[in-house]
UniProtKB/Swiss-Prot annotation:
The gene is plsY. Keywords: Cell inner membrane, Cell membrane, Lipid biosynthesis, Lipid metabolism, Membrane, Phospholipid biosynthesis, Phospholipid metabolism, Transferase, Transmembrane, Transmembrane helix. It is a multi-pass membrane protein. Its EC number is 2.3.1.275. The lineage of its organism: Bacteria, Pseudomonadati, Thermodesulfobacteriota, Desulfobulbia, Desulfobulbales. This is Glycerol-3-phosphate acyltransferase.
Amino acid sequence: MDFIFPLISYLLGAIPFGLLIGKLAGRDVRLEGSKNIGATNVSRILGKKLGFATLLCDSLKGFLPMVLAATLLPSSENRELIVCLSGVMGVLGHMFPVYLGFKGGKGVATGLGVFLFLSPAAIAISLGVFAASVFFSGFVSVGSLLASGLIPLWLYLLGASQLKIITAGFVALLIWIKHRKNIKRLMTGTEKSWKKK
């Protein structure tokens, strides 16, 4: 029965809040901008307020399933594993949502929720990395890649458990894989800068 939590986490993670918020505003974010359902594209198309709303909702898809699993599961050998797996499944749900033919977002906001549960201190450090990276480079993708990629290191330095470090590393890897087109555009100089309107 413990493994019902990861399944529920996937189904919750698959809820496309960016698309739903866009629809409520009369727009289909899959047809505009980067055509991504994530907070960055929603912000570009619909403004910062709705972009932030998307960021918050998508982050909760990673955070809340882990909170629920940690709260409802009794203490056992598998408790930390189920909690971490629930976070991973929330991210996979966002990236590959069953409701949208498995075509979803890049997982940064949902990953943020997972990382926040694993270590608020690590998130605080990586948010600083994100802000500095975006400010100096002009690219949100650079900030997302660096911030997520460094989370496992911060967890290691902060003395987190091996399972938490592995979980963070796997989520970061998923985020990097979903950003492969951004990485290619960064290498060819064709990535869109946040500073350019």
